[in-house]
Amino acid sequence: HEGSLVFLKAVIASKALEKSVQSVLSLLYHSPDSQTTTVPTTRSVTLILRSMPGVAYTTGSDLDDDHKEIHFSLDYIHGISESRKKDEIMGVLTHEMVHCYQYNAFGTCPGGLIEGIADWVRLNSDLSPPHWRKEAGGKWDAGYQHTGYFLEYIEHRFGKGTIRRLNEKLRIKKYHEKQFWTELVGRPVEQLWGDYSDVLDKEK
């Protein structure tokens, strides 16, 4: 598949995977030696490049959920513009790698928040694509960059390490929205979303 050649020319697979893991761990966790660091028990990540619709997805392998698989579309890779190939491949890999190493409140975390955290990590790895925009229409947990930029606002407002604390909170208990956000930053998420919307209005 021509997408395979594009991938192999753009990145060295082993280094690309290693770099994306480092980005995820440095943004979502304290240093490995810290007693407060509890990284998930992911034992392996297998990258599978294949022809398929869409962009990419991550799943547990048939062995068990500690072995992850990232499926990345060769058709999508082939269609990336020349100037964006490396950054887009690294951006997608980093986003998917978050799903291998993030917590989800025992399966109760909203999907939009899960995807927002992944794009927040991508954003903070300097891999955001040029078409991403901050927007405050709709719901805060619509996911992806929509939620990713909102999380970036929260990180700046409440201090570096806030999203790391959010991920840790998703490790230890189930997600009950009002309680979760009030315990994390002292106010409900709807209020934060309103504040964020006001900030974006002022930036226009």
Labelled PLM ranges:
Residues H1-H71:
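Auxiliary, metal-adjacent structural segments of Zn-dependent hydrolase domains
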Residues I12, A16-K19, S23, E88, ...:
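Extracytoplasmic/secreted proteins, especially bacterial periplasmic and envelope-associated proteins
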